[in-house]
A protein has these predicted regions:
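Short secondary-structure boundary segments
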Residues: 12, 44-45, 114-116
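Hydrophobic/aromatic ligand-binding patch that stacks against planar heteroaromatic rings
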Residues: 32, 102, 120
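PIN-domain endoribonuclease scaffold, especially VapC-family toxins
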Residues: 32-86
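Active-site neighborhoods of divalent-metal-dependent phosphate/nucleic-acid chemistry enzymes
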Residues: 77-111, 116
Length: 145
């Protein structure tokens, strides 16, 4: 019997990086998710943050409004979890609390984030990995480059 795929919450900032460039680990992670290498968990709040960030003027040079919509529609096939109740988890940056609460509510195996406030959490449940560390974990577990 095949193992269930890893369940992961990816920080919207990593997803923004994937939109900005098809080169690099963030895009590779989105591609791995599209190829069903892991289960991606999203919430209305996460998707709203992603939409808000991508609508900022500084990101207009990376894609039109239509391209942003196409990118956002990709996440319609992710596992949608209702926004969990607020929890105080990340003392250094309360704006990140919802990501950890979402991951806990969804019983995610990992959170992938480049945010230092998250990656430096000791004994985080679930563990927080940098995008590169999560990519390397996937590559090792699934035996692919």
């Amino acid at each position: 019997m095949a193992e269930a795929p890893l369940t992961v919450v990816i920080d919207p900032n990593v997803l923004v990086s994937a939109f900005v460039s098809e080169l690099g680990v963030p895009y590779a992670l989105v591609s791995a998710w599209v190829a069903r290498r892991f289960e991606l968990v999203v919430s209305p709040e996460l998707l709203a943050e992603l939409r808000e960030v991508l609508s900022r003027d500084k990101f207009r040079r990376y894609g039109s409004d239509a391209e942003v919509e196409v990118f956002l529609r990709r996440f319609a096939t992710a596992r949608l979890v209702a926004d969990p109740p607020a929890q105080r988890i990340v003392a250094a940056d309360p704006d990140d609390d919802y990501l950890m609460a979402l991951a806990r509510c969804a019983k995610a195996d990992y959170v992938a984030s480049g945010d230092r406030h998250l990656t430096q959490l000791e004994d985080a449940v679930p563990p927080v990995l940098s995008p590169r560390a999560f990519y390397e974990l996937l590559a090792e577990q699934l035996n692919w480059p």
